[in-house]
């Protein structure tokens, strides 16, 4: 019954508005008031169903928001990053194909040299009786080759371990978290934009500092308190607001 009454009211409003439009169609004053009459009709019909009028958004507001974000200073972006309640991405590394290919090539060569040196060391160990028996009769270069192989083998394995350790100190992304914290993701970014050896660290903001005195240097060096060694950050990555100064505003520097 109530629905029928609502329908009757809507029909009456529509009939009244159509009568006003038909009688005042050729009145110039009424033509200027037609947008007002149209908005009044929408509001009156919506009030019948106890619904609020629909707000209309203009593209000008959207353009203002976009231009305000583009014109935002690093200090404003840093303030937004430190006051947000959600993770805010400040930096993300780009895939540098040259560095990645050189890194992979170096690792492959070291593995190959380590394998060859290991087999050579095994042969020397098996023939040690003959070698040491003739040690006095060997010349200087032969002795130097045996001594050098004894030092090169552990040095190669140490170098390989160091190269595999570097991705743990290579920063992939930095994000701000609530309660004045950072989420630092480390890893090796391949030429195909795949992250290997990734690890996530959540540390307080006060424990992170930039050691590099200039952002024009590459890589940028970061230090985390109570953690050994330094962390490296590729300066050619993506920054919030497309400005490197955001790092100094968010992290800060300590020489």
Swiss-Prot record:
Keywords, comma-separated and alphabetical: Membrane, Mitochondrion, Transmembrane, Transmembrane helix
Record GO cellular component, one term: mitochondrial membrane
Membrane topology: Multi-pass membrane protein
One Pfam family matching this protein: TMEM70
Main location: mitochondrion
Keyword Transmembrane in annotation: yes
Localization of this protein: Mitochondrion membrane
Ranges that cross the membrane: 99-119, 146-166
UniProt entry tagged with the keyword Transmembrane: yes
Domain of life (superkingdom): Eukaryota
Name the UniProt record assigns to this protein: Uncharacterized membrane protein P22H7.04
Organism for this UniProt entry: Schizosaccharomyces pombe (strain 972 / ATCC 24843)
């Amino acid at each position: 019954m109530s629905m029928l009454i609502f329908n009757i009211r809507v029909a009456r409003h529509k009939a009244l508005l159509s009568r006003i439009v038909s009688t005042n169609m050729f009145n110039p004053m009424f033509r200027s008031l037609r947008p007002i009459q149209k908005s009044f009709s929408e509001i009156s019909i919506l009030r019948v169903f106890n619904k609020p009028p629909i707000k209309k958004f203009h593209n000008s507001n959207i353009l203002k928001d976009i231009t305000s974000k583009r014109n935002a200073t690093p200090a404003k972006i840093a303030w937004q990053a430190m006051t947000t309640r959600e993770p805010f991405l400040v930096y993300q590394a780009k895939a540098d194909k040259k560095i990645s290919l050189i890194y992979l090539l170096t690792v492959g060569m070291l593995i190959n040299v380590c394998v060859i040196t290991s087999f050579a060391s095994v042969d020397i160990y098996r023939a040690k009786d003959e070698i040491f028996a003739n040690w006095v009769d060997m010349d200087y270069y032969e002795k130097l080759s045996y001594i050098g192989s004894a030092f090169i083998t552990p040095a190669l394995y140490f170098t390989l371990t160091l190269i595999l350790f570097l991705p743990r100190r290579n920063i992939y992304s930095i994000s701000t978290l609530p309660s004045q914290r950072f989420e630092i993701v480390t890893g090796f970014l391949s030429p195909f934009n795949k992250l290997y050896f990734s690890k996530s660290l959540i540390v307080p903001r006060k424990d992170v500092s930039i050691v590099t005195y200039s952002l024009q240097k590459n890589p940028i060096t970061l230090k985390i308190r109570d953690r050994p060694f330094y962390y490296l950050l590729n300066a050619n990555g993506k920054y919030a607001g497309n400005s490197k100064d955001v790092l100094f505003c968010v992290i800060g520097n300590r020489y």
